[in-house]
Amino acid sequence: MTREPILIAGGGIGGAAAALALARQGWPVRVLEQLREFGEIGAGIQLGPNVYKMLETLGLTGAIDATAVRPDALVMRDALDGEIVTRVPLNNAGFAKSFSYPYAVTYRADLHNALIDACNAEPEIELAVAAKVTGFTDSNDGVSVQLEDGGRIEGRALIGADGLWSNVREILIGDGPPRISGHIAYRAVLPATEMPKHLRWNEVV
């Protein structure tokens, strides 16, 4: 008897990681991504020891280490005068003894690509694009998911990983749209060779 899949709304980092974790436990999974292709928007992302433990469980440390950088330290500076507030050494013997796993930074797209590649290689996972979840109905036997194009998909359960403007969250919790904090963060990725020499340090600041 064919088991109905666990459905995941959203194929970003969270959705892909959830799909891979479930498939490794023997669950059939169907990822429903609203865009027409899988992709990740953003710049860098920090990978702490807790994340590396998860990556090891999923068998992804090799793929991540191929592109990630392990900085020497995490530095906090005063926003007004630039003075160092504290400096935390990383990836030394003491850090390894305390946390067992490393600390690294990588490009968000590289992390996402590694997850999607692993999902594509997993026979229990089906990746669907142009499949935006707009609603769902629970039942004793599972869940029926409504798509924007009018289609309907049956599954054992539904996981909402459809981002900041999540339709699943709005239906389930109904706490309104995200509130704007008034803060703006500017991010960019560029080759280290284009940085001024005095800024070419191997630290997260």
Locations of regions flagged by a protein language model:
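Conserved hydrophobic helix-helix packing surfaces used for dimerization/oligomerization
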Residues: 6-8, 29
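Glycine-rich Rossmann-fold phosphate-binding loop(s) that bind the pyrophosphate
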Residues: 10-12
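Conserved N-terminal helical subregion
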Residues: 1-6, 23, 50-191
